[in-house]
Each structure stands twice: as structure tokens, then as C-alpha cells.
């Protein structure tokens, strides 16, 4: 019952103390079903009352205990047909009433079982639908999460690619600047060296105090033992050199 209809629930019933088919084993009846079963007993009680009144008046017309002499002529006059007694009629009514009650209660029980089965099927269907919906939502969440992660990965890859391009451009620009600086520095160095060489070459000076220098050398060669005799020439030579230096500084200052 419920989710799988192939396996049925075993249901048994029995008589209670009032001989009503209301005791079930295997299923719990709701209060609504019990009330309906109680309502179904009301016509039966009326019929039982009428049957009881019939049995009360029956002994006057049909005595239940008659002697052999009383019953025998009656059977002879009717041609051998036996008339039903009051006790038999009451028992037959009671059995029919019990059977009708059994059928009504059985129909109510079957209706209740069908309702329970329908409710269990609906409950199982709702649970299955909820489970499918939950699984679908979980799948959608996982899919959205995967899409979000993939999008973030693409964004990070694009950012890394952009940074790589930026740093390559910066490195290339720095290399170009360094190369330009080196070229300018080399040109400036060569220009400065060339200018310095030209300035040095242009400054060709004649020897100063050549006459005094020759006189001193001659004096030293002649007075090897008495070089103090050449001291006056040495003083004049120093004065001449000092004057030439002052003149040079004044001209190029």
C-alpha cells in the first residue's frame, strides 16, 4: 500500500462483544469511519426491535412448545407443509441483519482502505516529487557553482594575460630606454674625449726660459765640484719659470 501497490497489507476482522464487525487487525480505523459504522447500525436496531415485537406476538398464534397431538392435526390439514416458528423467523431476521451489517461495514472498511491507499500514494508521490525537486535544485546549484568557478577562472586567466602583456611592454620600454641612454652616454663620452684631445693638441707650448736652462746646464758641466757657483743662475731660472706659469694661468683663466 502507498508507494508500491504490488504488496498489500494483510487485514483481518472479528466480532466485538456486541457482535459488530468492527475489530480490525492490520489497519487503524479513523474516527470518521467508526462514526459512519455507528450510523449504519441505527436501521439495524430498528429492524431488531420490529423483529423482537414479532417474536413477542408470535407465541399467541404459533406456540413454540406444542404437544404432539396439537401439531399433528395441523400438519395433516395443510397437506404436510411445515409452518415456520417464531424462533426461526427471529433467528433468520437476526442473521440477515448481521449479514447486512457485515456488508455495510465491509464496504466502509474497503472505502477506508482505498482512501488510505490513495493518501499513501499521494504522500509517496509528494515525497518523490520533493526528492526530485531537491535533487534538481542541488544539480542546478552545482551547475551554477561550476559556471561561476569557470567564469572566475576565465577572468583570472584574462587578468594574468593582461599583466603578462603589460610587463612585457614595460620591459621592452625599459630596454629601449637603457639602450638609448647607453647610446647617448657613449656619444657624449666620445664627444668629450674628442674635444679634450683637440684642446690638448691645440695647447702646444714652447719651452720657457730656454736660454737660462742652457746656461745652467753649461755651468753644472763646468763646475762639477763647485756647483754652488751656479746658484745665481738657478734662482733666475726659477723666477723665469714662475713668471711663465703666472702668464699661462692668466691667459687661460
Swiss-Prot record:
GO BP terms, alphabetized: cristae formation; DNA damage response
Ranges for domain CHCH: 206-248
Locus of motif Cx9C motif 2: 230-240
Low complexity compositional bias, start-end: 48-64
Region (Disordered): 1-89
Residue stretches of biased makeup (Basic and acidic residues): 28-44
Major localisation: mitochondrion
Lipid addition sites, N-myristoyl glycine: 2
Alphabetic keyword roster: Coiled coil, Disulfide bond, Lipoprotein, Membrane, Mitochondrion, Mitochondrion inner membrane, Myristate
Cellular component annotations (GO), alphabetically ordered: MICOS complex; mitochondrial inner membrane; mitochondrion
InterPro entries: MIC19/MIC25 (IPR007964), MIC25 (IPR042860)
Topological category with respect to the lipid bilayer: Lipid-anchor
PANTHER family: MICOS COMPLEX SUBUNIT MIC25 (PTHR47609:SF1)
Function of the molecule: Component of the MICOS complex, a large protein complex of the mitochondrial inner membrane that plays crucial roles in the maintenance of crista junctions, inner membrane architecture, and formation of contact sites to the outer membrane.
Protein name, as recorded: MICOS complex subunit mic25
Lineage, top ranks: Eukaryota, Metazoa, Chordata, Craniata, Vertebrata
Amino acid at each position: 500500500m502507498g508507494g508500491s501497490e504490488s504488496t498489500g497489507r494483510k487485514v483481518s476482522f472479528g466480532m466485538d462483544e456486541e457482535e459488530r464487525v468492527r475489530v480490525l487487525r492490520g489497519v487503524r480505523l479513523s474516527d470518521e469511519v467508526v462514526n459512519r459504522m455507528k450510523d449504519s447500525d441505527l436501521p439495524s436496531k430498528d429492524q431488531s426491535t420490529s423483529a423482537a415485537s414479532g417474536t413477542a406476538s408470535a407465541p399467541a398464534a404459533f406456540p413454540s412448545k406444542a404437544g404432539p397431538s396439537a401439531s399433528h392435526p395441523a400438519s395433516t390439514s395443510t397437506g404436510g407443509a411445515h409452518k415456520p416458528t417464531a424462533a426461526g423467523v427471529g433467528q433468520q431476521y437476526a442473521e440477515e441483519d448481521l449479514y447486512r451489517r457485515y456488508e455495510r461495514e465491509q464496504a466502509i472498511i474497503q472505502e477506508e482502505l482505498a482512501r488510505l491507499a490513495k493518501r499513501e500514494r499521494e504522500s509517496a508521490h509528494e515525497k518523490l516529487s520533493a526528492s526530485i525537486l531537491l535533487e534538481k535544485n542541488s544539480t542546478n546549484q552545482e551547475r551554477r557553482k561550476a559556471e561561476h568557478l569557470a567564469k572566475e577562472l576565465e577572468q583570472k586567466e584574462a587578468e594574468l594575460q593582461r599583466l603578462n602583456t603589460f610587463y612585457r611592454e614595460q620591459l621592452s620600454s625599459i630596454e629601449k630606454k637603457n639602450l638609448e641612454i647607453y647610446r647617448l652616454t657613449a656619444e657624449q663620452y666620445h664627444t668629450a674625449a674628442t674635444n679634450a684631445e683637440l684642446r690638448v693638441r691645440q695647447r702646444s707650448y714652447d719651452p720657457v726660459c730656454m736660454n737660462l736652462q742652457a746656461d745652467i746646464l753649461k755651468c753644472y758641466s763646468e763646475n762639477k765640484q763647485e756647483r754652488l757657483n751656479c746658484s745665481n743662475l738657478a734662482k733666475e731660472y726659477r723666477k723665469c719659470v714662475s713668471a711663465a706659469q703666472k702668464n699661462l694661468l692668466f691667459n687661460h683663466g
